[in-house]
Amino acid sequence: MQKYWREARSLLALAIPVIIAQIAQTAMGFVDTIMAGSVSATDMAAVAVGTSIWLPTILFGHGLLLALTPVIAQLNGAGKRPSIPHQISQGFWLVAGLSVLIIAVLYNAGHIISMMDNIDPLLADKAIGYLHAIMWGAPGYLCFQVLRGLCEGLSKTTPGMVIGFIGLLINIPVNYIFIYGKFGAPALGGVGCGVATASVYWIMYLLMHSYVARAPSLKDVRRPCTFEAADWATLRRLIAIGMPIALALFFEVTLFAVVALLVSPLGIVAVAGHQVALNFSSLMFVLPMSLGVAATIRVGYRLGQGSTDSARVSARTAIAVGMAMATCTAIFTIVLRKPIALLYNDDVQVLTMATHLMLLAALYQISDSVQVIGSGVLRGYKDTRSIFFITFIAYWLLGLPTGYLLALTNQITPAMGPSGFWIGFIIGLTSAAIMMALRIRWLQRQPKSWILQRAAR
């Protein structure tokens, strides 16, 4: 039992800085929305529309680079630290290719926006301007993620936390300058949020680069100053590990975007109640997601050491801690759902809808915790292809169709409205949790030599 307590402490030591860093990242989006809204409702809506396109696009690139964390953790555990700089160099080659792709998509995003029904021309122009500004921050964001992956793979999650908060603090005055046109800058309104965010991403990368270049503990894993050509064998391995993660993230983000679009014809009360419940549950999601990152690091490190038993302990402990935390957050949500909803809106109808949906959100928090931490464990085992298939089946083949039938049709029950989609979320997330748990159990029952050979890829 003692080994599980020790492992829990190690996991929490890694997860807490990730939680704080994620809160800082979320707060940047919140600040953008509030400051754009102070100019006009159109500017705020333009930032929201632009973000709905920016987010799945950049998270695809982010997901691909998540391959670096288990690779570096495994090399660190195996005592092969001299091989780490090569992986980082190839990570930057991935960034080069991803940046071209992402900028091309965002540059042409006007075609996507023009397909939206009855969109206001001014809103569309501002949303396109926002995307054309923020797209130049994509290389900076992705370069930051490469170095963050290096640090996290070496069990150093604090730098990402510190720099994330510095980024948040810088974002506020830079937003002020470009939104309102201060100190000689043009007043860009919502478009200024894109300029500010792009600038902040580059600053965050430069700060992380400075940390990596100066930290004594990273002296042996720094990249040499000499140019290193692309190594197609290494790039193929990283893409093979990262692509399923990228696609899984993309499908997850687009799922919630599709549900938001399907809810929108149901009226203002339905949309507002859905948004309140989704916003709060997204905040709660930060906790298990951060434990999932910690699980990836610990499992990868233990497999690098050649200890499948210790990797199993890390996996079990992460899931157990996550379930305990989810039980607490579920009780918190059930008991305090009305005061929490009042923080967002005091309209009686919206309040009633939001509190009902938050009750459903509380029901899936344990399942959500198991599936996201399970995904982190599978990343540690480098079993990422299964993550893609599980999330695709659970969300798009089970959760969304069931939610659609319950919410908008009378085929199973009389149309339930937004509640139907949330029951679909429960079904999808619970299915994902069960499949993740079964996959982990199957993996851990394989011969030790097979597990270690697979982890050393």
Swiss-Prot record:
CDD domains tied to this protein: MATE_NorM_like (cd13131)
Transmembrane feature ranges: 11-31, 53-73, 93-113, 127-147, 160-180, 188-208, 239-259, 277-297, 316-336, 357-377, 387-407, 418-438
Stored InterPro entries: MATE_fam, MATE_MdtK, MdtK-like, Multidrug-R_MdtK
Localization per record: Cell inner membrane
GO terms assigned for molecular function: antiporter activity; xenobiotic transmembrane transporter activity
GO biological process: sodium ion transport; xenobiotic transmembrane transport
Pfam families in UniProt: MatE
Example of a GO cellular component annotation carried by this entry: plasma membrane
Location (main, coarse): membrane
Keywords for the protein's UniProt record, in alphabetical order: Antiport, Cell inner membrane, Cell membrane, Ion transport, Membrane, Sodium, Sodium transport, Transmembrane, Transmembrane helix, Transport
Membrane topology of this protein: Multi-pass membrane protein
The protein's role, per its UniProt record: Multidrug efflux pump that functions probably as a Na(+)/drug antiporter.
Family: Belongs to the multi antimicrobial extrusion (MATE) (TC 2.A.66.1) family. MdtK subfamily.
Protein name according to UniProt: Multidrug resistance protein MdtK
